[in-house]
């Protein structure tokens, strides 16, 4: 259905001598985003990583890990871990962007798009926007399950929404990075394997599940400079949840919100152009 819409749009452009414009590119992005959302509706199991996984992770870490976890000052582990679970679920689910692009390239779908005078980058932008909407669903699931297991934010609604916004911005930035992995891989399975090797340590070598206070010094440095730690700490601060800090922390530890925004913007600035370059190279004869 989306291919037909693109064909109709392309034909109308040719008849009126259409020149590329921002409005036309935006329309291409909307069509490509809708195409990805339609695929999800036809195969709802694609949403398991943003619906089922958050529920399992929340129950597992709150009731299993939380039963033996002691935080400084006797803070609630549930309140501590929910922002970490939010970030971790968004990080692990971001690999769907790379796998989806690798799938489209391997099954010839992108070759069909090349026959149309559409904005080529709309394939990438549409994919990342659709995955951003999936990430928003994941955030909502984490919040609902968190409330069910006893998590409560300590700040006003606007601050809480800002926390979700920071997490979603990082998720969108990471989607561009995983898009590069998908474009470098020759098969979806390869993209998944490589992505797992990158995403797994990124998610777990951080303060998402445990404070970095008692980690070995060399590991604590890595965890403190991990962008996942900055995002998680900033979300905790915006939510008004416990965020134990070392007495003498590094710059990202002392300024988590600034570090999270810098990491996100820098990742988009680097990964988006690189993904566009890789896409042109993969789709140019």
PLM region descriptions:
Residues 2-14, 239, 243, 251-285:
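Junction motif at the cytosolic side of a transmembrane helix
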Residues 2-8, 24-31, 204-249, 258:
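Short hydrophobic, aromatic-rich alpha-helical segments embedded in or entering the lipid bilayer
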Residues 6, 12-53:
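Aromatic- and glycine-rich beta-strand/loop motifs that create alpha-glucan
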Residues 32, 50-51, 81, 85, ...:
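Residue-level recognition of transmembrane alpha-helices
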Residues 56-61, 77-149, 174, 178, ...:
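Hydrophobic alpha-helical transmembrane segments of multi-pass membrane transport proteins
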Residues 61-70, 92, 149-154, 158, ...:
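Short helix-capping/hinge motifs at transmembrane helix termini and TM-loop junctions
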Residues 63-68, 182-229:
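Transmembrane helix segments
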Residues 120-195, 255-276:
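Alpha-helical transmembrane segments and their short interhelical loops
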């Amino acid at each position: 259905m989306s291919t037909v819409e693109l064909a109709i749009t392309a034909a109308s452009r040719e008849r009126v001598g259409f020149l590329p414009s921002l409005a036309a590119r935006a329309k291409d992005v909307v069509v490509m985003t809708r195409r990805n959302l339609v695929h999800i509706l036809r195969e709802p199991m694609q949403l398991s990583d943003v619906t089922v996984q958050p529920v399992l992770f929340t129950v597992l870490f709150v009731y299993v890990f939380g039963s033996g976890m002691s935080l400084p000052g006797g803070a609630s582990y549930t309140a501590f871990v929910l922002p970490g679970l939010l970030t971790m679920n968004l990080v692990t689910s971001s690999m769907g962007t790379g796998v989806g692009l690798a799938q489209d390239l391997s099954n010839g779908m992108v070759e069909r798009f090349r026959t149309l005078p559409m904005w080529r980058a709309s394939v990438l932008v549409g994919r990342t926007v659709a995955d951003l909407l999936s990430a928003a669903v994941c955030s909502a699931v984490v919040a609902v399950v968190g409330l069910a297991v006893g998590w409560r934010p300590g700040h006003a609604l606007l601050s809480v929404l800002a926390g979700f916004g920071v997490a979603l911005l990082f998720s969108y930035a990471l989607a561009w990075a995983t898009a590069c992995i998908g474009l470098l891989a020759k098969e979806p399975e390869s993209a998944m394997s490589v992505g797992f090797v990158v995403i797994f340590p990124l998610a777990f070598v951080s303060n998402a599940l445990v404070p970095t206070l008692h980690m070995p010094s060399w590991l604590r440095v890595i965890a403190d400079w991990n962008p996942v730690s900055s995002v998680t700490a900033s979300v905790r601060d915006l939510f008004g949840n416990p965020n134990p800090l070392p007495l003498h922390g590094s710059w990202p530890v002392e300024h988590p919100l600034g570090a999270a925004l810098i990491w996100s913007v820098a990742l988009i600035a680097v990964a988006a152009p690189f993904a566009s370059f890789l896409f042109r190279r993969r789709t140019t004869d």
